[in-house]
Curated annotation (Swiss-Prot):
This is Formamidopyrimidine-DNA glycosylase. The active site is at P2 (schiff-base intermediate with dna), E3 (proton donor), K58 (proton donor), R259 (proton donor). DNA binds at H91, R110, K150. Its EC number is 3.2.2.23, 4.2.99.18. GO terms for biological process: base-excision repair. SUPFAM superfamilies: Glucocorticoid receptor-like (DNA-binding domain) (SSF57716), N-terminal domain of MutM-like DNA repair proteins (SSF81624), S13-like H2TH domain (SSF46946). Its cofactor is Zn(2+).
Length: 269
DNA sequence: GGGCGCCCAAATA
DNA sequence: TATTTGTGCGCCC
């Protein structure tokens, strides 16, 4: 389920439910997701209290005295907090039970996600990540400067997590539409002015999506703890043959780097 | 830098 | 019933 806004909403939903909660039991319902889930979490996290929850890129970082639990939701992961007696659902692979009688469960049908642990909070997977798109370091000159001499297409470029994190397939399409840039354009062949516009569009699109997701938070701990995708805000993604908001021509679908791209041939140049 | 493949389920043919 | 497609991303060539 996750792109950056969905992970951010998950984080915000978790904060009031699990901060300061003490772990009574850790359950691994299977040994691995994308990678092995460390078995020693069962002993390491026992009786540990959750201190903070942060997000870096699409990783959730849940901090304990003993170290940091690193969770990635992959393509289909979601987290919910339920009463401990709630029957376990299919694909709920990992569970943290708390002394207050609730349980945080990770559901991930495709199992592309990950549950990892780091004593000092650092991790190989976090080392080579680019800047956060909603922070000030992602400024108007950043993409322009990073894109010089890049021959790959601009969509792939903004989806490169070594450059900027958290821009997935949906919001890459949406941002390029909002900025009126053709996704097939070579990254190194886009002007400083257009990158400035694109930068603001990425920030706007992500911020809007987080805002839309915020409305789902009151239901976060209910039966459906999955905030889902905020489809009401999408202008091009999944909109093949639908009408462009601006010029009324048809949105088309192409394939780039084995991923679907949706765009308006007339508006995006 | 491009493409593969991990895995399951829903949509489509 | 069989095939295609999908919100991610590390790894291999």
């Amino acid at each position: 389920m996750p792109e950056l806004p969905e992970v951010e909403i998950t984080k915000r939903g978790l904060v009031p439910l699990i901060i300061n909660q003490e772990v009574s039991r850790v359950i691994l319902h299977r040994e691995n997701l994308r990678w092995a889930i460390p078995k020693n979490l069962i002993t390491i996290l026992a009786n540990q209290k959750i201190k903070t929850i942060k997000r870096r890129a699409k990783y959730l970082l849940i901090k304990f005295e003993a170290g940091t639990l690193i969770i990635h939701l992959g393509m289909s992961g979601s987290i919910k907090v339920v009463d401990i007696k709630t029957p376990l659902l299919k694909h709920e692979h990992f569970e943290l039970q708390f002394n207050n009688g609730t349980s945080m469960r990770l559901n991930d049908p495709r199992r592309f996600g990950a549950v990892l642990f780091s004593k000092d909070g650092s991790h190989k997977l976090l080392d080579s990540l680019g800047v956060e798109p909603l922070e000030a370091v992602f400024n108007n000159g950043y993409l322009y400067q990073k894109s010089r001499n890049k021959r790959k297409n601009i969509k792939d470029f903004i989806m490169d997590s070594k450059i900027v994190v958290g821009v997935g397939n949906i919001y890459a399409c949406e941002s390029l539409f909002m900025a009126s840039i053709n996704p097939q354009r070579k990254a190194g062949n886009v002007s400083k002015t257009r990158y400035k516009i694109l930068t603001q569009c990425i920030k706007d699109i992500l911020t809007q999506a987080i805002k839309a997701g915020g409305t789902t938070l009151q239901d976060f701990s209910q039966v459906d703890g999955n905030p889902g995708y905020f489809t009401q805000t999408l202008s091009v993604y999944g909109c093949e043959n639908k009408t462009c908001h601006f010029c009324k021509s048809k949105i088309i679908k192409i394939v780039q780097n084995q991923r679907s791209t949706f765009y308006c041939r007339k508006c995006q140049t």
